[in-house]
From Swiss-Prot:
Organism: Homo sapiens
Cytoplasmic compartment segments: 23-45, 104-127, 197-223, 275-299
Pfam families: TAS2R
Protein name per its UniProtKB record: Taste receptor type 2 member 5
Function recorded in the entry: Receptor that may play a role in the perception of bitterness and is gustducin-linked. May play a role in sensing the chemical composition of the gastrointestinal content. The activity of this receptor may stimulate alpha gustducin, mediate PLC-beta-2 activation and lead to the gating of TRPM5.
Gene: TAS2R5
Main subcellular location: membrane
Lineage of producing organism: Eukaryota, Metazoa, Chordata, Craniata, Vertebrata
């Protein structure tokens, strides 16, 4: 018999799953639609497609974990599911980092020669460097997940409490998030500085005029700021989700922490859609056509 609190958490988890499914699915459809319309992949479309695809997978992994954990608490497959979960989560962070670098390249308005050189050369170089780092981290994560899953046993001279070892396990699996998070923060900081300098120029030269570039700055910063907040909640809830599964497992705690984690892939997709007029209009058309088709084919 489920308690009322656990039933409410399950309802919230399902709602978050449906929001993420619709939001990220709409972004994936929009990206493919743009490709079919133009027969050319732009950097922005590729980033949005990768980001939405990772979030789509992340939503499924969270709901699978919540569904399977009560039934298969000691199964080896849950170990593999957790490793894949970490990889998809880190890939999502990488694509968000690519998005922040893309915004920084397209929107910032510094006039210094060093920055102009960096803007022209370092964008592609940073993407290749981040991609290489991601591949290395993928291999390390798989190795850690497969060989460092059980705490020391027997007569080992070094012994960890099970909960402490689980925190160490979470720390090692998430170690690949640090570099992309630093790049993300640097890019976002450059956007903030660029907005500040641009705002000072506009106050002097064109008071009262409509400032399109400032609006682009603010839209990008809203998206990146919401992502950072949701990602920090996700990162802070992750270790508690792991330790709540230790013996004896606390199912209510698992649902609390993973429901908080599920807000990251579901809500940020809506923020992306609402912040980009083209995507918002396209997604509205897609959803309207889906509803109309459902009414036509429904009973």
């Amino acid at each position: 018999m489920l308690s009322a609190g656990l039933g409410l958490l399950m309802l919230v988890a399902v709602v978050e799953f449906l929001i993420g499914l619709i939001g990220n699915g709409s972004l994936v459809v929009w990206s493919f639609r743009e490709w079919i319309r133009k027969f050319n992949w732009s950097s922005y479309n590729l980033i949005i497609l990768g980001l939405a695809g990772c979030r789509f997978l992340l939503q499924w992994l969270i709901i699978l974990d919540l569904s399977l954990f009560p039934l298969f608490q000691s199964s080896r497959w849950l170990r593999y599911l957790s490793i894949f979960w970490v990889l998809v989560s880190q890939a999502s962070l990488w694509f968000a980092t690519f998005l922040s670098v893309f915004y920084c390249k397209k929107i910032t308005t510094f006039d210094r020669p060093a920055y102009l050189w960096l803007k022209q050369r370092a964008y592609n170089l940073s993407l290749w460097c981040l991609l290489g780092y991601f591949i290395i981290n993928l291999l390390l994560t798989v190795q850690i997940g497969l060989t460092f899953y059980h705490p020391p046993q027997g007569n080992s001279s070094i012994r960890y409490p099970f909960e402490s070892w689980q925190y160490l396990y979470a720390f090692q699996l998430n170690s690949g998030s640090y570099l992309p998070l630093v790049v993300f923060l640097v890019s976002s900081g450059m956007l903030i500085v660029s907005l500040y300098t641009h705002h000072k120029k506009m106050k002097v030269h064109s008071a009262g005029r409509r400032d399109v570039r400032a609006k682009a700055h603010i839209t990008a910063l809203k998206s990146l700021g919401c992502f950072l907040l949701l990602h920090l909640v996700y990162i802070m809830a992750s270790p508690f989700s792991i330790t709540s599964k230790t013996y004896p497992p606390d199912l209510t705690s698992v649902f609390i922490w993973e429901t908080l984690m599920a807000a990251y892939p579901s809500l940020h997709s809506l923020i992306l859609i609402m912040g980009i007029p083209r995507v918002k209009q396209t997604c509205q058309k897609i959803l309207w056509k889906t509803v109309c088709a459902r009414r036509c084919w429904g009973p």
